Amino acid sequence: MQSPSLDPAKLTFRDAVEDDLPRCLALDASFQSDYVWQMTVNDGGDEIQVSCRRQRLPRQLVAQHPVDERQLLMALHMDNCFVVVEDPYSRQIVGYVTMRLDMSGRVAYLQDLVVDLLHRRRSLGARLVHVARVWASEFRLQQIIFEIPTTNYPAIRFAQAQGFTFCGFNDHHLANREIALFFSLSI
């Protein structure tokens, strides 16, 4: 379901400020999925095989993107990216992206890409990825790594559609101890 009054062409993309945090936390970051990615690792000494397989769920999963208020607060620092999408007329925030910078590896880690449920399917996510790429190129970074839980199949498909490619995983990377998949995008 979309909000009929929002004109995507007139939205403002700007750096977040601390006063934006409550509005960002209030966004509906939920998602629905009929699939998850199942990870299998076979460690055979001289060879490690990792298999990623799309698995259909017995019933639709409704879940929430894990948003950490402390992590958002840390994203406000100058060496991180925190950009919000705002309707300039209503002053309503409809989405945001956060990335943390790793200058030693010349990488940005995309941690949050949130578009409010009512405002999806309008290319706002793709526009936020573009903003993230511009930000990363200004810091002369080489790539963006997108961290996605295995249960967020819509985000995985979105990342792939934006040109991100699978580059690894971590069993207990996320705050809720869920498996994180990593997708990279060269700058």
Question: What feature does the model see in each segment?
Answer:
Residues A26-Q111, D116-L117, H130-V131, W135, ...:
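Acetyl-CoA-dependent GNAT
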Residues M1-K10, L25, Q32, R177-I187:
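Terminal substrate-recognition subdomain of acyl/acetyltransferases
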Residues V115, R121-V134, E138, R157-A161:
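Conserved acetyl-CoA-binding loop-helix of GNAT-fold acetyltransferases
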Residues E147-I148, Q160-L181:
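Conserved catalytic-core motifs of GNAT/GCN5-like acyltransferases
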Residues D19-P22, G105, Y153-P154:
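Short alpha-helical
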Residues A16, L113-V115, I148:
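Hydrophobic adenine-recognition pocket in adenosine-nucleotide-binding enzymes
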Residues A136-I148:
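Conserved GNAT acetyl-CoA-binding A-motif
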